[in-house]
Amino acid sequence: MNYNIRGENIEVTPALKDHVERKIGKLERYFDHSVDADVNVNLKFYNDKESKVEVTIPMTDLALRSEVHNEDMYNAIDLATNKLERQIRKHKTKVNRKFREQGSPKYLLANGLGSDTDIAVQDDIEEEESLDIVRQKRFNLKPMDSEEAILQMNMLGHNFFVFTNAETNLTNVVYRRNDGKYGLIEPTE
């Protein structure tokens, strides 16, 4: 894995860098072979009482992301790594369940699940949470700009809002971030 460690309001010391690489490097044991992925780690230090660690590992068939707030930076790194490990194990369980259901490795390879991000089989499989859809809504997407979409989202009291961007005529999503600001998701066409 290639590590990109960035600090905001904190100097990334060699000890901090070693801790990140050592902890996140342990995740490689879940993969059959060496993972060629860029690990993006943002370390943010707000004050004496709060630090934040964001870890993103984009891979071909899986994107891992973890965000943790904690008083201690090292503890936050440990907790973020634990979250990533749970995500990997959950994905591994899903792949293994599909493998058992289909009954043959040929099916997995034919359907693209035998790619370079296969998760190594281990005995300690966690049960996957239920992914039942409990409500479904249908509505027409009104063309609008992102500011109007944010106003609509706030008026409805939602954390996100799907709309058709009037400028690009593509479906976009605005969402409220944890820091109170807003984000926009756009397709790449």
Curated annotation (Swiss-Prot):
Picking any one GO molecular function of the record gives: ribosomal small subunit binding
What the entry lists under InterPro entries is as follows: HPF/YfiA_ribosome-assoc, HPF_long/plastid, RHF-like, RHF/RaiA, Ribosom_S30AE_C, Ribosom_S30AE_C_sf
Q: Which UniProt keywords apply?
A: Cytoplasm, Stress response, Translation regulation
Question: Subcellular location, in the record's words?
Answer: Cytoplasm
Q: Which CDD domains match?
A: RaiA
PANTHER family for this protein: 30S RIBOSOMAL PROTEIN
Name the UniProt record assigns to this protein: Ribosome hibernation promotion factor
- Encoded by which gene? yvyD
